Every structure is written in C-alpha cells, then in structure tokens.
C-alpha cells in the first residue's frame, strides 16, 4: 500500500477562506483547501505548503500554524493530510502553474473566496469530509490562531 503525505492551507483572506472549487469530469463539484503532496525535494512540510500555494494560486502566505490532520484510506492508497492555518499576503492567479493545470482532463481549479463562517461553509461539499467537519466546528476560531 502506498502512503501519500499532503499539506493543505486554511488560507485566510480577511474574514474569508481561499478555497478551490473543483470541477472534474464525471464527478459532482466539490471544494477543497489548496495544497498537495509533499515532494522528496521539499525541505519540510511548511516548504511543501508554500510551494503548493505558489503553484496553485500564485500566492504567498504569512506565518503558518498546524491545526489538524486527518487520514483517508483507499484500496491502494493511504493519504495523510496535515492542515495549516495562514493568512494570505499576496495572490497573482496569472502565476498559477504545475501539472494539474497542464492536462485539461484534470478538470477545473477555480478559486472561490468563502466567508469563514459555519453558515457560509455549511452548504458547500468540502473534501475531505473531515475538513468540512473541522471548519463547521472551528471556522470562527481560525483568525485568532494567528498573530
């Protein structure tokens, strides 16, 4: 069984979260936090997170703080996701790059700014499911976790 370690950002932009709205062929639309796989060349999980934010959003984030982790078990893959809260410093979507954008069969990665409130987050399908549960319980607390 393969194990994939991933990092994801709960990226705050004022009182909102920067999320990716994913549209993939043959699948319902869902939302997720930006981030991805920790590569062997990444010096640390935080370095991987900053690389992923640059690739997926052309974004720079301020200080990060780990807030939770979750595991997903598939038939051939065990995925460990570690989530960090951070504030958006800058974002330039024209700088987006990476393999996910090179192949149209990967679907769309639309940026969606969603108020960081349980009411705004409740109606959207957040993946993984533990992300949705965490945000419903802790969305209001996230801004206070950072300097």
Where are these regions (language model features)?
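Active-site-adjacent beta-strand/loop module that shapes the phosphate/pyrophosphate-binding cleft
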Residues: 72-100, 112-117, 129-138
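Conserved N-terminal beta-strand and adjoining loop/helix that marks the start
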Residues: 1-18
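Conserved Nudix-box catalytic region and its N-terminal flanking loop in Nudix hydrolases
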Residues: 16-55, 59
């Amino acid at each position: 069984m393969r194990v994939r370690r991933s990092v994801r950002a709960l990226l705050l932009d004022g009182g909102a979260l920067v999320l990716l709205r994913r549209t993939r062929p043959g699948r319902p639309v869902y939302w997720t936090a930006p981030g991805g796989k920790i590569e062997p060349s990444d010096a640390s999980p935080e370095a991987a997170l900053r690389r992923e934010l640059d690739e997926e959003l052309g974004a720079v984030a301020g200080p990060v703080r780990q807030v939770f982790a979750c595991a997903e078990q598939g038939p051939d893959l065990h995925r460990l996701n570690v989530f960090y809260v951070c504030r958006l410093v800058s974002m330039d979507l024209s700088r987006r790059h990476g393999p996910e954008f090179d192949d149209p069969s990967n679907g769309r990665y639309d940026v969606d700014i969603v108020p960081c409130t349980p009411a705004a987050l409740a109606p959207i399908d957040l993946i993984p499911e533990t992300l949705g549960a965490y945000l419903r319980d802790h969305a209001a607390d996230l801004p206070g976790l950072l300097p």
